[in-house]
Amino acid sequence: MTYLTTWTADARPRLLEETTDPARIAAVLAAIAVRFERWPLAPGLPAGAEAEDILAAYRSRIDALSAAEGFVLVDVAALHPSAAADWREVAAAARARFLAEHTHDDDEIRFFAAGSGVFYLHVDERVQAVRCEAGDLISVPKGTTHWFDMGVEPDFAAVRFFRAEDGWVGAFTGSDIATRIPDFDALARRSSSAAQPQAEAPAAAS
């Protein structure tokens, strides 16, 4: 499930809020001009589906969004666990690419067709860490300081929308804030714990 945590953006970040409620997540993100919505998952797509199959499965929604927002290029970024000898090296390099805080000269729009990844949005002395899951669409406005973590074992497929071929190039801020906020894997463990049902307290003795 989609999971949002809010942290202070100081030397010792503190957790201010956590939620899995889609309406609350959308409201928190809307307050910082970040678009968040859910698309129905396309039936029949197998695990590890090819890019062309993902694009075909969501073609009507992709075309509608592209026409409305002026996107000229759409592709699929995907990485899944593999038995290849160099997979961990490839995964680590892919993860490191946007793991530090940066901005873009264009909006960053991603639709997760499979798997998950965490966008960290640093706005107004807060960091909103939103773990996007399959079916989530997120649009980060240009100029927003943020970073993205796919975890130590990436497993996701995301449709990317661009208004220009070079719009995804990152301008890094030099801040080390990304090292102070829990990463993808720490948040995954935290959300799993939060989702566990709590045992009922024993009845008080009469």
Swiss-Prot record:
CDD domains: cupin_ARD. Pathway: Amino-acid biosynthesis; L-methionine biosynthesis via salvage pathway; L-methionine from S-methyl-5-thio-alpha-D-ribose 1-phosphate: step 5/6. GO terms for molecular function: acireductone dioxygenase (Ni2+-requiring) activity; acireductone dioxygenase [iron(II)-requiring] activity; iron ion binding; nickel cation binding. Pfam families: ARD. The gene is mtnD. GO terms for biological process: L-methionine salvage from methylthioadenosine; L-methionine salvage from S-adenosylmethionine. This is Acireductone dioxygenase. It comes from Frankia alni (strain DSM 45986 / CECT 9034 / ACN14a). Belongs to the acireductone dioxygenase (ARD) family.
